[in-house]
Swiss-Prot record:
SMART domains: TOPRIM. Residues 81-176 form the Toprim domain. The gene is recR. This is Recombination protein RecR. One of its GO terms (biological process) is DNA repair. SUPFAM superfamilies: Recombination protein RecR. Signal peptide: none annotated. CDD domains: TOPRIM_recR. May play a role in DNA repair. It seems to be involved in an RecBC-independent recombinational process of DNA repair. It may act with RecF and RecO. One of its GO terms (molecular function) is DNA binding. The keyword Nucleus does not apply.
Amino acid sequence: MDLYPESILNLIKSLSTLPGIGRRTAERLALHILHAPLHEAQTLANDILELKQKVTLCRTCFSLSDQPECRICSNPRRDASIICVVEKPTDIVAIEKSGAFSGLYHVLGGALSPMDGIGPDELRIRELFSRACSKTTTEVIIATGTNVEGEATAAYISDQLRKKGVNVTRIASGVPMGGDFQYVDQVTMQRAMEGRRGF
């Protein structure tokens, strides 16, 4: 039997639908919000509404943006001749944190997965081909995941773009910094050995 008032139970139920939030965490969050000052609860509610109302997809790269074009695509200092292809907007965040890339991005919206009914038409591959085949593009870097779906997506895009004469590269994968060899799987070790370079 639930001993909380219905409004608290409703919030617990809503919060527990979020990824990684179970009932106990949702309960703690709901009680925290209940005991927080009213202006904090209003700010949280307003931020959620603003997020839903303002955040959309960039018309160029399909990343998250609150403007028609995202901050990266509208930045004249970015190298518009190189496009890095990723599966989701959070992949851009990871690459940007590294500081290793200064070009533009293209978010596919997932990876090919025939078992789940996701083919090329369900992703933003057609839009990628249109951008990649422009005269200003000199290279397309494929930065999809290293799982089966990511590799299949990379292979498909690479094959199609090479037929169109586009220079395509794939990000390297291998042993992580500080990684212990005994925990590295065979495929990762094989790729690390194949992708080795001069020192």
